[in-house]
Amino acid sequence: MNPTSTNERKVIITGIGGQGIVFLTRLFSQTALDLGLGVVVSETHGMSQRGGSVISHLKINGSDAPLIQRGSADVMIAMDPGEAMQNLDFMRRGGTVFVNSAEGLHESLAPHLERLDIRVLNHPATATAVELGSPAAANIVLAGFVAAFFILGLPYENMIQTLKQISKKGSE
């Protein structure tokens, strides 16, 4: 996928308060903007300060409507497997879910995922971040995992550059 193409990408980024969902959204949206792509972002913050649900709607080269309709997201990036399950109804047939988990999503969802041809790619981002000595960087680990698949059309090198620009620690 050419990063400067007009292909629309609808992305749901979800997790619970304190997992860096807003930062992840900023990383992806700023990278897209720096590449000259159109970006629309909308965030909902349940009781995010108390560990509640946080959902960001990110459209790259999409319509100006702020929210992604249920059944139309191309990609979901979930810092929490429970939040991924709660928000599966946003996914379109043939979409891809990236989840911070060693096991993926609960096996009871397999028939639903198979029926809709939804691909689930899991990576234990929290465990990896802890192993690297920076537990708070689990969201960045998951972002790197997503970038490796180039599914958002955002080159890894550009994401690194954006990370350095927006992160206090990224420039150290």
Regions found by a protein language model. Name each.
Residues 1-172:
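Active-site cofactor/cluster-binding pocket
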